[in-house]
Amino acid sequence: MKKRILAFTLVLAMTLFCFAGCGKKQEAVKDTPDKTMTDVTLNEVAHSIFYAPMYVAIEEGYFAEEGINLTLVTGFGADKTMTAVLTNEADIGFMGSEASIYTYLGGTEDYVVNFAQLTQRAGNFLVAREPIDNFSWDMLKNCTVLGGRAGGMPEMVFEYILRKNGIDPMADLDIDQSIDFGSTAAAFSGGQGDFTVEFEPHATALEQKGDGYVVASLGEDSGYVPYTAFSAKKSYIEAHPDVVQAFTNALQKGMDYVQSHTPEEIADVIQSQFEETDKETITTIVTRYYDQTSWKDNLIFEEDAFTLLQNILEESGELSQRVPYADLVNTEYAQNAAK
């Protein structure tokens, strides 16, 4: 735990200038009446189809309808997204909620508070070198798996699934954590590992190239977990409650859209967010997430979900003590948006 807190401290000291030039102004698709607009910078942990409801809200003009002029920045990691929020490079962060726990336990006075939960399942997949019709998790024993960063949600959920299936992550297999996030698919194509844990679009890309085959969904096998949420510094929420409410309202409209439209329709809306990916591939990926109920129908971060998150952190050896739900989660804005 001390190492995890130290990691965030070092990031604060070393990465203050990582975010310049990375922002993209998100233009409203719909015409909106003249109104006073508020600039909001949102730093997302990654740019992924997994977060489709947020991109629907952008592309359908829901943020503009709520009076928000949104700039979206990709942080490429929860540590960097958290740093952007804590150093006022971003107003709102979108990342795994474990980051809020780490900073809280690290003694940050103006800590971040989660106010809206977007995803309720893990968004990554286990990829094998050959198709496996009747996959079982014990097939990973004595194998090498390309995994994720220690202390991050992808890796902790993977280890959580292993333990649920009677597998010791430390003793029964070799989890290679030496490869940077985003580079594991290329390493797997190059011959490293027997399996790899991949987000989209990398999982589908491996299949399309014939280099790998999805054999399991971590989202399905883990059950419901509070995977990603929106958060802001306590002081920002206190100073700008109307902005936080408007932001959450826009997100809820995006959630409503994905609940009432087909994967094909969702793919049509978000395609401009992923210009390097063809429409058919986007539809395939959206369908995967859609079929496993990745997205909640509301944004309320329930207490039992937060308890499960702390259970996962504790089992992974990343939590030295429990933190209060009431301190790190505010459901007021999500509840209002869901009405």
Task: Give, region by region, the residue ranges found by the protein language model.
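Short, low-complexity disordered leader/linker segments with a strong preference
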Residues: 1-39, 336-339
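Short, glycine-/small- and polar/acidic-enriched structural segments
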Residues: 29-170, 174-178, 187, 194-201, ...
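Soluble non-cytosolic domains of exported or imported proteins
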Residues: 48, 75-79, 94, 152-153, ...
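Short polybasic/polar patches that bind polyanions
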Residues: 58-59, 64, 163, 207, ...
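A generic alpha-helix surface/boundary motif
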Residues: 97, 156, 230-231, 264-268, ...
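Pocket-lining segment of extracytoplasmic ligand-binding domains
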Residues: 180-274
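Secondary-structure end/capping motifs
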Residues: 238-320
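Conserved C-terminal helix/tail region of periplasmic/extracytoplasmic solute-binding proteins
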Residues: 307-339
